[in-house]
Amino acid sequence: MMLTRRAALLGLAGAATIGASRAPADPDVVVIGAGSAGIAAALTARAAGLDVMVLEAMDRIGGRAFTDTATFGSPFDVGCAWLHKADDNPYTDYARAEGFTLQAHEYDLERVWLGPEPTPAHLVNEAEAAMSETITDAPADVAASTIVDLSSPVDEAAGDYLGALDMAVDLDELSTFDYANADDLAPNLLCAQGYGSIVVHRGRGLPVRLNTPARGVRWDGPGATVETDAGSIRARAVIVTASTGVLASGALRFTPDLPVATREAIADIPMGMLAKIPLKIRDQRFGLEPFTDVLLARRGRRDLYFLSFPFATDLMVGFVGGDLGWELSAAGEAAAVDFATQGLVEMFGSNAAGAVVKGGLTPWASNPWTRGAYAAASPGRYGAREALSRPVGDRIFFAGEALAGGLIQTCGGAFRSGEAAAAAVRAVLT
């Protein structure tokens, strides 16, 4: 597995200040999950004077914001990488104030191959812009594939870049309303030290119990009881930041069952897949400048995107999404690295394979505490996001990237959702 124990040092360093004595035995609020939404919820609730305990199933904080600093000899964001909508992102000013290095980077394609043939990148960029407008203007919430023309290689490439490689689902699984109601995420920033490092830094010192998955939530009496392998915790309210994939799996039981509308909403916002295949390159740059955006487009939804050598590191970071992302995640690291390496060969010739000295595959599909990359509403089910955001019995509150309004599928949006959930809890409890 590409992710090493040393890679989690930043997360554990943040947790090193945590002691059982610092977390109240029966807090006002239990927050389930110490990702971006959970960190924001805990910070906001504590600022409101509420006692908080955070339960985290993994051995680190940060959730899907995780920077691996060991595997490749330079920071690699296993999950969240771009600070989207940077002028309104809750991490931007914080990162600058704390000395993180930020670099503007939009992801307009600069180099494109349609199969083995180099193609002017502007053709795909223009086709994607036109397709985006068509989907945004859709009068009904339907699958995006039903209203766009994908007959030409350029249009198919644009559709894959817009759908699988951005929204984490192919166009036949993309809700037009879900897409239309997502914000324009420009401007975008990347962080030299890793976005995950920023998130962990912001969450340092919170009362988090690591390696403590919540197994159940009982809400059949006053307040709620959260059940863990180490015992039960009574609280006046619970903020649940687990992904919709985890919620749908039944790994977190609710007693009594959640209302039908809530359960249906969870099912209607399934997890999509965007997997990264980082390749470490030796003594070669393929004529690419750092941060160059490259797309190898193949017919049949087999597209591969690369972010080239960010911050002048030795990494070509490959991305695959949608059904292909799930397929390669199931096939495993060796198959994924071979797929990405062969992509380099198609674009740059047979010698490219010899330049690859190490590769990896991000684990979000197989991680039982994520079960996907980020959530995408099913066609016709855009309203499920609002339905899931409603509190249950004024005791159970949901938060996360799936409930981030216009900032769905983003780390900054998850933070805003956590803040909102904590504010709603405060309104009920105080």
Question: Language-model segments: what does each one mean?
Answer:
Residues M1-L3, G14:
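N-terminal secretory signal peptides
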Residues L9-T430:
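FAD-dinucleotide binding site
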